[in-house]
Amino acid sequence: SKGTLLNQADFILTLMSVFWDEGRSNLELFCRETRNPDTKDSSPFNYFIEPDPDQLLRASIAYGFKRARLQNVYNVLRGKDLDTGEFSDRRRNKQFKILQKAQEEVLDIQNWHEFFKVLVSAGFRRGDVISSETGLIYTYAMYLIGKNDYKVDPFELRKTMARWFFMSALTARYSSSAETQMEQDLNNLRSVKTGDDFLSLL
């Protein structure tokens, strides 16, 4: 249920408070600033989405861990070995470094605003015509994967992600069982080796 999903996100946010409080604070500040029009060039304010911390956390997890199911990521962030069930501080620290690097990209102002050009290319001008914020968040994660992991040409990436987002919105791809659908989409990336492969998959 949706309540369960929110609780899982809350568990991870609580872990962040304990082991990486600066990361949670940065996440919450970014979300607040999306709601405040600002004259600064570096403001995350936009006309598409006013995200909550749990939404951008999902983007970081999808991008960094290539996972959508938060329960599994919660366990690895606690330092749990999913095969043996054992916990270790070293494993936890390693996983938090992955989350830290992912969140840096998700909260990067240039990435954030470049992504909105994808939505404009898809024919969207504002958030009230977008039916699924989850779809937007997951598309942002896929955009970052294409940009950073596969070094896709910026023009080709924008064009392909615009088509991906438009079709996702049209088919309500992430409107129900969003975690399951995104988990499948991320699993499909396992066979992708090049930027061309990434574009072909989408």
Kindly give the residue locations of the regions a language model identified.
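A cross-family structural signal marking well-folded subdomains
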Residues: 2-12, 19-202
